Amino acid sequence: MFHRRKRPYNTRNYGHDDKKFKSQYIDIMPDFSPSGLLELESNNKEGIALKHVEPQDAISPDNYMDMLGLEARDRTMYELVIYRKNDKDKGPWKRYDLNGRSCYLVGRELGHSLDTDLDDRTEIVVADIGIPEETSSKQHCVIQFRNVRGILKCYVMDLDSSNGTCLNNVVIPGARYIELRSGDVLTLSEFEEDNDYELIFMNV
């Protein structure tokens, strides 16, 4: 039976890597106040409580561009391009348009349960962007668009996943918004041998 690799709680040593991302941290941290927890309880999908609660300044790219009154030809478009590492010569495995919503949950989607007692049952998928990697978590990370002082910015946040989220081959801290820039590459484990897919954030 397959065993997912897990690290003990709070044992990652980010060291210099953590400092690398300090300039990309946003001032506003996730809301874990009582009111935020109450909102979290009502935030569920398929009966599963979602870890991520959107911030007050969440906005979709489409709504932001509408707010500015921009014509289609003048708008910046956002997408997530996913490649299977061993099949890059075949082109992208999937493309996701990121313009219509303010956030996208990324997580495991295998089509079957990892529990051997539930092999015949269909896996419950809560992710908006599903990745068929057994070592990734159901709620692995989230891509979040925000209106930060009038400027549209996109962030990634690791949702305290089992094996971490890497941005350009560096493990990012959990539960912190890290700004994404066009061409950034995300992988869903800090262990290179676990990563069959690369997620590339693009804006054009």
UniProtKB/Swiss-Prot annotation:
Signal peptide: none annotated. Keywords: Cytoplasm, mRNA processing, mRNA splicing, Nucleus. SMART domains: FHA. The keyword Cytoplasm applies. GO terms for biological process: maintenance of RNA location; mRNA export from nucleus; mRNA splicing, via spliceosome; U2-type prespliceosome assembly. Residues 104-172 form the FHA domain. Pfam families: FHA. It is found in: Cytoplasm; Nucleus. GO terms for molecular function: mRNA binding. It comes from the Eukaryota. Its main location: cytoplasm. Transmembrane segments: none annotated. Belongs to the pre-mRNA retention and splicing (RES) complex composed of at least BUD13, IST3 and PML1. Present with 1470 molecules/cell in log phase SD medium. Required for efficient splicing and pre-mRNA nuclear retention. This is Pre-mRNA leakage protein 1. It comes from Saccharomyces cerevisiae (strain ATCC 204508 / S288c). The lineage of its organism: Eukaryota, Fungi, Dikarya, Ascomycota, Saccharomycotina. The gene is PML1.
